[in-house]
Amino acid sequence: MKKFWTIVICMMLLGAVAFAAVGCNKGAGDTINVFSREDGSGTRSAFTELTGVLVEGEDGTEKDMTFSGASIQNSTNAIMTAVAQDKNAIGYVSFGSLNETVKAVAVNGIVPSVDTIKDKSYELQRPFNIAYKQSNIDNNPLAADFLGFLGSRQAQEVIAAEKYIATDDNAPAYVKGSDLTGSITIGGSSSVSPLMEKLIEKYCALSGVAKSSIELQTIDSTAGMNNAINGTFDIGMASRDVKDSELAQGITAEVLAYDGIAVIIHNDNAVEDLSMEQIRQIFTGEVREWSALA
């Protein structure tokens, strides 16, 4: 009989330990793990401005209030991979890069889609810009021809097929230039890069230009603009508005396409919709637990 009660007591103690462990795991699992892009990212610049994470101080200077404990990732793919592997994660990426490995939440009740971005009912959206020094284009017939292609009907079709918003529904057909010698260096935003890669493929197929003649470097928007300014890149890419200070240094900017910014979470996360204010609070660190959003 004594042995029986000893076994019962041991089982009760084990149960209490297990219950306590479950309780601890539940509490830890409720913490929101914030993932953000690096400084210089056009996606971060647009996201922080649109959500109010970027604030203006009393002296008129802007300050990015992104949560100091956020895990910083240096590309679109890095953000998606990190969020896909963490059930408590939240991040943001280009809508055009979105895939089934993560879940995009509605913002203020509006689900991101081509239609809601196009009609502007989905608020988190921004332009994809290209920029260049006109003198560089004038001295590079291949770059000039490629720019002409980017404004063509065929380019607009590629943009739409890749889930971005085209800028001209009545664009003219591409007409191949006569002098397609030389090379082009294009670089900048990791959000624009996947679309640019598709556009380069289409251009090479239409023009007969070897793909090796066009170098595509994936960095970030700020580097893209700076390298367009100093002439390292024939064409720079930015997933944000081109700044007045950048334009003042002699570059010409054109909108390539429009894109949404998707707020993403793990596929197993039950959250479906967040308000813009909730997003701001999460990414500034004011709200640290998923349960606080209920």
Model-predicted segments: where are they?
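Sec-dependent N-terminal signal peptides of Gram-positive bacterial secreted proteins and lipoproteins
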Residues: 2-26
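Exported/periplasmic ABC-transporter solute-binding proteins
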Residues: 24-294
